[in-house]
């Protein structure tokens, strides 16, 4: 415990460091993700972002007990995630594999909303998959349901 307090002035600073480490990991994953197509890479990363969102919920809520939403760690982290993921969305949109009428911010907000749902993966997984299916272009959805 003493080691923690030598490295961090208080609990808030420790929580900020943990949150930032998780953001670093999700940003790095955006650069390293692999997949057969741009849409597959985007979808794979969004699955990782979902897992990040579900796990960071606890750290974020505890951090909010020691600070508020105006803390720069939140806005700076969101900006970094958007910058890291934007190339994935642009590539998938340029390949005409995902809708062009949704922004990355809207997509991330959808994933965050699903990640906030309490439940086991067997419960939340189909909800996430339905959300991700909604990223397909409307013409692709119609032909797939056809």
PLM feature spans:
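Alpha-helical DNA-contacting segments of helix-turn-helix folds
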Residues: 15-22
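Helix-turn-helix
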Residues: 1-13
């Amino acid at each position: 415990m003493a080691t923690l307090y030598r490295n961090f002035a208080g609990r808030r600073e420790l929580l900020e460091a943990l949150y930032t480490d998780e953001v670093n990991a999700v940003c790095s994953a955006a650069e390293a993700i692999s997949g057969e197509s741009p849409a597959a890479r985007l979808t794979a990363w969004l699955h990782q972002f979902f897992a990040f969102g579900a796990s960071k919920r606890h750290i974020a809520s505890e951090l909010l007990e020691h600070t508020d939403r105006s803390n720069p760690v939140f806005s700076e982290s969101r900006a970094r995630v958007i910058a890291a993921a934007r190339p994935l969305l642009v590539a998938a949109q340029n390949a005409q594999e995902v809708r062009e009428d949704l922004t990355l911010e809207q997509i991330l907000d959808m994933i965050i909303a699903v990640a906030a749902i309490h439940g086991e993966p067997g419960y939340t997984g189909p909800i996430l998959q339905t959300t991700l299916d909604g990223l397909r272009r409307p013409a692709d959805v119609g032909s797939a349901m056809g």
